[in-house]
């Protein structure tokens, strides 16, 4: 069996493991966006009939997995490993989804890079003979993420004035122009060592780049340096240039992060005129009030499985 070749930070796959099938599921805002027609399933109910936002995210991921297997005509019993992650603490949504799916499971937490991480690790496992049928998936849910990370008082509990009579207070901060909207979406890919489908030729694992961006409402600026560093290493390791590719996709830098990415690469002598950010195309920024664009693990996962594939 051919061995994966390592060149710098990049793994070069010799057998081209393939994405044999993919499925994307989204919520209400995604159903109103420009890519709505390319989802496998959409719901106007962001709870998806579940009792909580967190349970809804579990449903998102489970539904994407089952649709993916259905499209591949593969019984779930033949899945040898699932690599999955989400934005909840300790991969809660993924763990509960995999409890119902009943397949071997390894949880991933790469936040917005989870889908790419799953594809890279999955391709390496497939080429190495560790799995013949492997699922890579990721999800996020706007309300679950807001409750956990950003505005717990608004989505989780009530803050009361004192003394009595107690009056509930609502969280009323204005979203800044650099802020992004966490996608309520999930995507799932079925990876196989060989066969019909889109081949995975290489994978570059990025390095942490900390430019001391401390604005919690500007994640695009925080992520752009790592995106630039990863692309620079990929081009160096593979001996390729940006213009050789039909398109260069990033996950969810948003409008602000995408502009910074282009500036950082231009400073290194690279122009990426063929760049598209998944967070910039999932929603219509002018019509849907998402500020700088979409974000979250489910953003690029759904765009990959629904739009790109």
Region spans (language model):
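Conserved small/polar residues in nucleotide/adenosyl-binding loops
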Residues: 160-165
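A generic local secondary-structure boundary/capping motif
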Residues: 6-9, 123-126, 155-159, 175-180
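A generic, well-ordered mixed alpha/beta core segment in the N-terminal half of proteins
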Residues: 96-147, 151-159
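Conserved "HGTGT" condensation-loop signature of ketosynthase/thiolase-family condensing enzymes
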Residues: 1-106, 168-178, 187-309
């Amino acid at each position: 069996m051919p061995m994966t070749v390592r060149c710098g930070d990049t793994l070069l796959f010799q057998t081209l493991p393939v994405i044999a099938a993919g499925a994307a599921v989204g919520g209400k805002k995604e159903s109103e966006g420009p890519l709505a027609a390319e989802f496998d399933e959409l719901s106007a109910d962001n709870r998806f009939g579940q009792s909580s936002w967190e349970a809804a995210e579990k449903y998102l991921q489970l539904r994407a997995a089952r649709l993916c297997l259905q499209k591949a005509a593969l019984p779930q019993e033949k899945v040898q490993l699932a690599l999955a992650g989400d934005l909840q603490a300790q991969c809660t949504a993924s763990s509960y989804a995999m409890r119902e799916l009943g397949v071997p499971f390894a949880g991933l937490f790469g936040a917005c890079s989870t889908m790419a991480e799953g594809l890279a690790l999955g391709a390496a496992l497939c080429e190495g003979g560790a799995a013949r049928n492997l699922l890579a998936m990721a999800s996020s849910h706007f309300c679950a993420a807001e409750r956990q990370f950003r505005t717990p008082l608004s989505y989780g509990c009530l803050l009361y004035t004192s003394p009595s009579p107690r009056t509930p207070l609502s969280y009323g901060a204005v979203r800044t122009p650099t802020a992004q909207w966490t996608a309520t979406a999930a995507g799932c890919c079925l990876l196989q060592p060989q066969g019909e489908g889109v081949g995975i030729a290489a994978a570059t694992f990025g390095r942490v780049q900390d430019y001391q961006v401390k604005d919690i409402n500007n994640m695009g600026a925080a992520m752009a340096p790592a995106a630039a560093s990863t692309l620079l290493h990929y081009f160096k390791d593979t001996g390729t240039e940006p213009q050789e590719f039909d398109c260069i996709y990033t996950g969810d830098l948003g409008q602000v992060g995408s502009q910074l990415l282009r500036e950082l690469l231009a400073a290194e002598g690279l122009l990426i005129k063929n760049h598209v950010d998944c967070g910039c195309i999932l929603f219509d920024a002018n019509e849907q009030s998402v500020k700088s664009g979409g974000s979250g693990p489910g953003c690029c996962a759904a765009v990959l499985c629904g739009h790109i594939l």
